[in-house]
């Protein structure tokens, strides 16, 4: 893990780049960030604030913008963008992720809003509005699926050793089948 894990390397190098950035050595922070991107395929702006315990899994293509904040215990999968929707300097342009958030592969979280603690963002979702704590956002454009149904489903799924963050309320046959199986198991 220490020698061959790009997510770990990117976070280690980001901490150095962030320290340089905050100390006023902007060029050095950007340079370390650039080297990190070249080595890992993960682009984290040196101004981004990333708490301890963040996990970037299969991180190729992850982009985290300058004013983004990522809370403790958050998991980010491949191809995720925490991006901005404005070029305004001095403004909060990138999202804030609370604690223990899961962001699925390919998701785009765009803008200066908050994704609450324990929220989930489904794979390939495009989120442009706040996500409440404990909720799940899925789709393009993202919509919030019922938190109480999601909580019951997640509890049943965890008893089976399965993470159901990608199970949606969509009417497509595969989603209906997955919901039915997990809801049936929940009893």
Residue ranges and their predicted role:
Residues 1-37, 152-187:
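Terminal amphipathic alpha-helical/low-complexity segments used for targeting or macromolecular assembly
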Residues 12, 127, 144:
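Short phosphate-engaging motifs
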Residues 6-7, 12-15, 48, 54, ...:
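Solvent-exposed, flexible loop/coil residues
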Residues 85, 105-111, 150-151, 167-171:
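Short C-terminal domain-edge/linker segments immediately following a structured domain
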Residues 40, 45-46, 51-52, 57-66, ...:
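Left-handed beta-helix
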Residues 89:
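Glycine-rich phosphate/ribose-binding loops and adjacent secondary-structure elements
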Residues 135, 140-160:
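Conserved beta-strand-loop-alpha-helix hinge in the C-terminal portion
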């Amino acid at each position: 893990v220490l020698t061959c894990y790009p997510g770990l390397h990117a976070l280690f190098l980001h901490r150095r780049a962030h320290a340089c950035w905050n100390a006023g050595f902007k060029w050095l922070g950007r340079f370390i960030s650039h080297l990190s991107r070249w080595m890992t395929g993960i682009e984290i702006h040196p101004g981004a604030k990333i708490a301890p315990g963040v996990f970037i899994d299969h991180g190729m293509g992850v982009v985290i913008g300058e004013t983004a904040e990522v809370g403790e215990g958050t998991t980010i999968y491949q191809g995720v963008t925490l991006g901005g929707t404005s070029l305004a300097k001095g403004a909060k342009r990138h999202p804030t992720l609370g604690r223990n958030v899961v962001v699925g592969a390919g998701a785009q979280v765009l803008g200066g809003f908050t994704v609450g603690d324990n929220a989930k963002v489904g794979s390939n979702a495009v989120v442009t509005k706040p996500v409440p704590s404990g909720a799940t956002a899925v789709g393009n454009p993202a919509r919030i699926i019922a938190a109480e149904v999601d909580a019951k489903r997640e509890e049943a799924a965890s008893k089976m050793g399965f993470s159901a963050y990608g199970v949606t309320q969509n009417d497509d046959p595969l989603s209906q089948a997955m919901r039915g199986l997990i809801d049936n198991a929940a009893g």
